[in-house]
Amino acid sequence: MRIKTRNFIMQTQQILTQLFDNQPLSQEQAAFIFGNIVKGELSNEQLAGALIALKIRGETIDEITGAVTALLAAAEPFPAPDYPFADIVGTGGDNADTINISTASAIVAASMGLKIAKHGNRSVSSKTGASDVLTALGVNIRMSTEQARKALDEIGIAFIFAQQYHLGFKYAGPVRQALKTRTIFNILGPLINPANPKRQLLGVYSPELLKPYAETNLRLNHEHSIIVHGCGLDEVAIHGLTQVAELRDGKIEYYNLSPKDFGFEPQPLESLRGGAPEENAKILTALLQGKGSEQQAQAVAMNTALLMKLFGHEDIKQNAQQVLEQLTTGKAFETLTKLTTY
């Protein structure tokens, strides 16, 4: 930890006072404070106070954007490719304990020729997060940056494990665990992929998050983002309406999608229940081999259909049918098998 200058102390105190007075921060102020949080420059008491003040008032777009830019600047670098690539990620926190739909969709999309740099972490709120199920499937989630980029180039998918790139998060860990409540860090997770993709399918646990994420991605110059909330899920829903915020070419459009828009009938959410990592790994293995249930295949088809839209495949009904056909070939399982060799 560096010696704190008088200027640093005054600036930090001014920002904290502003937060405690219920005043919003500018993007620059948010970048300053979060840049210093991940350097370990704030005391636990200061950090706890800042996080609670932000949570109680509600984080602004400026604050989220400033925090994202600071955390990306502090992250270990990932060499982003020149070709188009996307991320598919969820906030978690929907408490539904479904199978890992986003992870399966990422693998299927890669087997169809799309490039997916999937950013993820260990589960906090569900039984099995992306990294938990991938580990159970035999994937080395701690592959080096070079290996991850090689996998992205060669087989179309890389897993970027958050803990390996955001080393400064350790400074916030004890406070976050002590608070035992969602903070701005839960909002930031899906936005801080170090590969910095400009295309993203993002699932959120609450419909109230659609607008903040869409507007933040607009500020972050995303080319095409689709943010979804599906009837309580941070995925596209097989059991009801999905609320959507789509950012494209600097404009945000809000609309709803039903299973019928993808060519399907609604299915019960219960059919997607998962469990521990080993159980979810077995389900995903069968699914990627074309031996999953109709409902599981439908969930992956609907989510992958929107992922395909980010790459210019506009007809989501046609996309969903292509995904179902792809699942029957077993090629998605081949892609997973290749991923385990990196």
Swiss-Prot record:
Q: Which residues bind 5-phospho-alpha-D-ribose 1-diphosphate?
A: 90, 93-94, 98, 100-103, 118-126, 130
Q: Which residues bind anthranilate 1?
A: 90, 121
Residues annotated for anthranilate 2 binding in this entry: 176
Q: Which Gene3D superfamilies match?
A: Nucleoside phosphorylase/phosphoribosyltransferase catalytic domain (3.40.1030.10), Transferase, Pyrimidine Nucleoside Phosphorylase, Chain C (1.20.970.10)
Record-listed Mg(2+) 2 binding positions: 234-235
Q: Which GO terms describe its biological process?
A: L-tryptophan biosynthetic process
Cofactor mode of binding and number, as noted: Binds 2 magnesium ions per monomer.
Top class in the EC scheme:
transferase
EC numbers for this chain: 2.4.2.18
The entry marks the following residues as binding Mg(2+) 1, namely 102, 235
Question: Which InterPro entries does UniProt cross-reference here?
Answer: Anthranilate_Pribosyl_Tfrase, Glycosyl_Trfase_fam3, Glycosyl_Trfase_fam3_N_dom, Glycosyl_Trfase_fam3_N_dom_sf, Nuc_phospho_transferase
Q: Which Pfam families match?
A: Glycos_trans_3N, Glycos_transf_3
Functionally, this protein is described as follows: Catalyzes the transfer of the phosphoribosyl group of 5-phosphorylribose-1-pyrophosphate (PRPP) to anthranilate to yield N-(5'-phosphoribosyl)-anthranilate (PRA).
Q: Return the similarity comment.
A: Belongs to the anthranilate phosphoribosyltransferase family.
Subunit structure, per the record? Answer: Homodimer.
Question: Per its record, how is this protein called by name?
Answer: Anthranilate phosphoribosyltransferase
The species this protein was found in? Mannheimia succiniciproducens (strain KCTC 0769BP / MBEL55E)
UniProt gene name: trpD
